[in-house]
Amino acid sequence: MNWITNYVRPKINSMLGRREVPENLWIKCPETGEMVFHRDLEENKWVIPQSGFHMKMPAKARLKDLFDGGIYEAFPQPKVAQDPLKFRDSKKYSDRLRDSRTKTELEDTIVAGLGQVQGIKLVAVAHEFNFIGGSLGIAAGEAIVKAFERAIAEKCPLVMFPASGGARMQEGILSLMQLPRTTVAVNMLKEAGLPYIVVLTNPTTGGVTASYAMLGDVHLAEPGAEIGFAGKRVIEQTLREKLPEGFQTSEYLMEHGMVDMVVKRHDIPETLARVLNILMKKPAKAIKRDTATELAPLPVAASA
C-alpha cells in the first residue's frame, strides 16, 4: 500500500487542493465596503465605480493617464547617498529601501516626466505613496529640483501631484533640508514666468504640505483628499477639542480658501489644460468651452 500513500494520495490532494489566489485581486472600497476587481479599478483610473471614492493611484499610472496618448519622456532618478545616517528603528533603513524598490519597481518615491497634455508641453511630478509613504528624502528632493530645472530649460509649466506623509524621518535633518531646496526651485520657476500647478491628492501632509505642495499658482484637489500638516488625531489630542466634520479634506479647504477647485480624477487633464491656457495667456479660441458648465447670465433688476 506504500505506493498509494506515497504517490497516489499526494497526487490527488495536489490536484484537488485549493488553488492560491493572487493578492489584491479584489479591492475593497474604504467608504462603502464595495468589492471591485482590480482590472476594473485600474481601467476606471483607480476610482471606485459606484461610490466615486478616489483610491491612491500609482505614480507611473498617473503620468501615463495624464499625458496625451500615455506618451512621455521619463526622467532618470538622480544618484544620491544611500542611508547616510545608517538609520535603524524596528528595521534597517537600507532594508526598507530594498523592500520598497522591490514592491514598487522604483528607485525612490518621485516619478517625473516631460510630455503634452491636450497639446500643452509640461513637466509633471508625482509621488508614489507605496514607497515609504511617499516621504520626502534626499533622493526625492533632488528629483524634484531636477524636474523644476528641466521645466525652466524647456520653458514650460510644471504640474505637481503630491501624495506623502511628509519628511522621511530615517534621513533626519538631511530630509528637512529638502523643504527649503524645493521651495527655492519653485521660486526659480516663478521667476522664469512659468506656471506651477499643484494637484493635491490623498494624503498630502507634513513637510510636503509645509513646502512645495502649497506654493502653486493654482491648487486643484481630488475629492476627499486629506490635506494638512499635523494629523487630525494629533491636533485633537493637543487642543483637547473635537474638530469640525470633514476637517482637512479637500472640500473643507476649498470652502475656507485654501484650495481653488476640487476636481474629479477623470476631469484633471482637461481642467489643467483650461487653467494653463489662461495662465499662459493663450488666445481664447485655444480654450475649450464647456457650455454645460457655463454660468447663466445674471438677472436684470426690475426698474422702480
From Swiss-Prot:
Which GO molecular function entries does the Swiss-Prot or TrEMBL record give?
acetyl-CoA carboxylase activity; ATP binding; carboxyl- or carbamoyltransferase activity
Annotated Gene Ontology cellular component terms: acetate CoA-transferase complex
Query: What's the protein called, per UniProt?
Result: Acetyl-coenzyme A carboxylase carboxyl transferase subunit beta
Name the enzyme's class: transferase
Presence of keyword Transferase = yes
Function noted in UniProt = Component of the acetyl coenzyme A carboxylase (ACC) complex. Biotin carboxylase (BC) catalyzes the carboxylation of biotin on its carrier protein (BCCP) and then the CO(2) group is transferred by the transcarboxylase to acetyl-CoA to form malonyl-CoA.
Q: Name one Pfam family in it.
A: Carboxyl_trans
EC nos:
2.1.3.15
Q: Which organism is it from?
A: Sinorhizobium medicae (strain WSM419) (Ensifer medicae)
Entry-linked PANTHER family: ACETYL-COENZYME A CARBOXYLASE CARBOXYL TRANSFERASE SUBUNIT BETA, CHLOROPLASTIC
Q: Lineage of the native species?
A: Bacteria, Pseudomonadati, Pseudomonadota, Alphaproteobacteria, Hyphomicrobiales
Q: In which pathway does it act?
A: Lipid metabolism; malonyl-CoA biosynthesis; malonyl-CoA from acetyl-CoA: step 1/1
* Main localisation: cytoplasm
Query: Where would you find this protein in the cell?
Result: Cytoplasm
Superkingdom, taxonomy of origin: Bacteria
Keyword annotations for this protein, in alphabetical order, are:
ATP-binding, Cytoplasm, Fatty acid biosynthesis, Fatty acid metabolism, Lipid biosynthesis, Lipid metabolism, Nucleotide-binding, Transferase
Which HAMAP family does the entry link to? Answer: AcetylCoA_CT_beta (MF_01395)
Subunit (UniProt): Acetyl-CoA carboxylase is a heterohexamer composed of biotin carboxyl carrier protein (AccB), biotin carboxylase (AccC) and two subunits each of ACCase subunit alpha (AccA) and ACCase subunit beta (AccD).
What family classification does the UniProt entry report for this protein? Belongs to the AccD/PCCB family.
Q: Which GO terms describe its biological process?
A: fatty acid biosynthetic process; malonyl-CoA biosynthetic process
Which residue ranges does the record assign to the CoA carboxyltransferase N-terminal domain?
25-294
Reaction equation(s) it catalyzes: N(6)-carboxybiotinyl-L-lysyl-[protein] + acetyl-CoA = N(6)-biotinyl-L-lysyl-[protein] + malonyl-CoA
